[in-house]
Amino acid sequence: MESFKGFNVNLTAEQFERQVEKIGGAVAGQTNSTVPADKRMYAVRDVTATVDSIPLIASSVMSKKLASFADVILLDVKYGDGAFMRAPADAEKLARLMVSIGRKAGRKMCAAVTCMDSPLGDSIGCNAEVREAVAVLKGKKNDLAKLSLFHCEKLASLALGISEAEARARAEESIASGAALKKLAEIVEAQGGDVRAVYDESLLPLAKHCEVIRAPGSGRLKISALALGKACCALGGGRQKEGDEIDHSVAILLKRRAGDPVQEGEAVAEVYYNKREEDALASARGAFKTVQAYEPQPLVYSYIGEED
């Protein structure tokens, strides 16, 4: 959201709650006043080799969720190549534990275990991902849109006590009518962001240099989400250490999706960067492989609802 120039994610709990009551939405990051012990706990996990402990991950995640005062919470727990949890069974175990914690704290909870073997959308990088999110709110159909509508269906049904069919219909109508895009603009404006960028993607620029990545062979395309994420980060699109400045214009745009049939030499992606880093570009190229047989994973592996 900080791709919107001036956007303030550092809201206090009071500011967050007030904005939600006023306009129906807010986006905030973790601040020093929000679960301040969590960073210390993570530091302890780091030096005791317990970073991947499922109970400690669950307590860390849920401490922040419960501090938000939300009475209905939906969790999207990723698994796969680009996720912290590689195996779907481990992701589901984590999801069930977090749902249990939330319910014991009196919250209505649900969770979806979803696949991140390859990128969810067609874009990687701050400005590029915001552009794609805006496109979805304008009606673009892709996996990002499918998963977003799935989440809307489940969360609205749980929060409002309506059927999932009605919840989905309301979500689809909000996109078709332009209400969803208008709500994003309200949130951006309320938090000090440049609302013009919601309607003008040129205000969310991509980096000045572009390298085309081509298929290394003929067959079905296989894409590593982890390799692309690391490449984007190394090119400046993410922080490699605390205090690093993020270049919001760095981007990787997919021209073909995982599982698509491709011919050797066919363009499969574009990498946008301002500072050339050979290792990062090599990582991006290496993220694309071709195989003769490709088994797509379901977008949603499992769902833990109110009855589970």
Task: Give names to the regions the model predicted.
Residues 2-68:
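Phosphate/pyrophosphate-binding betaalpha-module
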Residues 50-53, 57, 64-308:
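Well-ordered secondary-structure scaffolds
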